[in-house]
Amino acid sequence: MANLLNKFIMTRILAAITLLLSIVLTILVTIFCSVPIIIAGIVKLLLPVPVIWRKVSRFCDFMMYCWCEGLAVLLHLNPHLQWEVHGLEGLSKKNWYLLICNHRSWADIVVLCVLFRKHIPMNKYFLKQQLAWVPFLGLACWSLDMPFMKRYSRAYLLRHPERRGKDVETTRRSCEKFRLHPTTIVNFVEGSRFTQEKHQQTHSTFQNLLPPKAAGIAMALNVLGKQFDKLLNVTLCYPDNNRQPFFDMLSGKLTRIVVHVDLQPIADELHGDYINDKSFKRHFQQWLNSLWQEKDRLLTSLMSSQRQNK
């Protein structure tokens, strides 16, 4: 009994030390990488010359790669972590990709950055407006031309119809900047992290997912057109740490990450005017919902297999 108690206490102490180390490491890496990116972003703003813009953008992408390497060290603080990754074949840093993914946790961004950093161009995320105010990180993301999306409720849009379509315009402006060099645009199309509360509030018909929001990726496809080489449909989960994967990651208790990558061609019928063409909008939503149904079945299979193993 005493041995079990001592083991429990030591495990808690080790988790607390790992948590502290992880937080300090994350802050230091973020500051070290974001400050040069912010300075470069200011240079890009003051000198909007195409040649300078391209060189500065490449430098910013390099610093983001360094940030991803720092996050990889963070994952190494999880000594029992096992990766199960399927579908990385055929990827290239010379291509343009649209990456869509389910969203379970803050850990998702760390996983995507670390996993894909050597396989595809640097990820550019669709971000919530609130993240713009996070010290260092917000300005760095702005310098990297990541679009900040401001979500409005249906009731708010009814009172302020002039706000309708603002996110779409933000997407269009950001995507125009990605034409000049290979880019991976990442969109968590659920618009928010999955929780049971949000699942009930949105009346989701999916078991493991929130309903997908189609406007952002539809606009990205419309602006960049055939410049996108492929669609990366990514499904990820943390079967052993499903309740709080990000906290478990920081505490060194993350044990298993499962990632399925489905590389798909982008059909011509997915390019169109999502805002004004109701027929296209309906077709696009049906296509995205069908992807989400497949993703939901895959997640159910992964989670049920884990329960059986236990």
UniProtKB/Swiss-Prot annotation:
Signal peptide: none annotated. The lineage of its organism: Bacteria, Pseudomonadati, Pseudomonadota, Gammaproteobacteria, Enterobacterales. The keyword Cell cycle does not apply. Residues 44-310 are cytoplasmic. It is a single-pass membrane protein. It comes from Escherichia coli (strain K12). Its EC number is 2.3.1.51. This is 1-acylglycerol-3-phosphate O-acyltransferase YihG. Belongs to the 1-acyl-sn-glycerol-3-phosphate acyltransferase family. It catalyses: a 1-acyl-sn-glycero-3-phosphate + an acyl-CoA = a 1,2-diacyl-sn-glycero-3-phosphate + CoA. GO terms for molecular function: acyltransferase activity. Pathway: Phospholipid metabolism.
